[in-house]
């Protein structure tokens, strides 16, 4: 479902209200091939946004990723096994691709992206999205648009 919930925004500089008609909320739910249920909501809110949160609930526990902005960071990762208390965890060193001395902030994500890009040319490296990955994503986006426009569930192969 794609909707426009907020039809007036305040100008960041002048403070004046102005009308908007762009969609600001996308919600979706689905069932993956492996049987896992998926539900998500993406919303652009004008005030006091709580940031971004990704929660994954599995048979053995829960993992949560929180950030004011995933694309800028920093992000915090929390893990709870079974019914134990949620605790912040540090990603394993194998996932940190940039030097420790690199300054904190948005540059970290850019550095990580460049490190992955550089590794993409190495023999046997398979962690790089390709055209086939893009086609899958575009089929999903198209199915979401069709579902919204037609008001029905769209099944993907």
Report residues per predicted region.
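C-terminal glycine/acidic-rich active-site capping loop/insertion
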Residues: 2-32, 55, 59-132
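Short beta-strand segments
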Residues: 1-2, 39-42
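Glycine-rich phosphate/pyrophosphate-binding beta-alpha loops
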Residues: 41-50, 105
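C-terminal capping/lid region of NAD(P)-dependent oxidoreductase domains
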Residues: 146-157
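C-terminal hydrophobic helical "lid"/dimerization subdomain
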Residues: 134-146
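Glycine-rich Rossmann NAD(P)(H)-binding loop
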Residues: 41-45, 57-59, 157
């Amino acid at each position: 479902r794609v909707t426009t919930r907020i039809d007036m925004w305040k100008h960041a500089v002048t403070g004046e209200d102005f009308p908007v008609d762009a969609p600001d909320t996308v919600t979706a739910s689905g069932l993956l091939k492996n049987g896992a249920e998926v539900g998500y909501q993406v919303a652009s809110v004008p005030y006091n946004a709580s940031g971004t949160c990704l929660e994954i609930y599995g048979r053995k526990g829960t993992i949560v990723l929180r950030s004011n902005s995933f694309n800028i960071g920093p992000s915090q990762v929390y893990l709870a096994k079974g019914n134990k208390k949620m605790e912040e965890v540090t990603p394993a060193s194998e996932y940190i691709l940039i030097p420790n001395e690199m300054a904190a902030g948005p540059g970290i994500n850019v550095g990580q992206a460049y490190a992955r890009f550089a590794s993409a040319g190495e023999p046997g490296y398979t962690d790089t999205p390709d055209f086939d990955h893009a086609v899958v994503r575009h089929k999903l986006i198209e199915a979401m648009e069709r579902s919204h426009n037609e008001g029905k569930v769209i099944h993907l192969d």
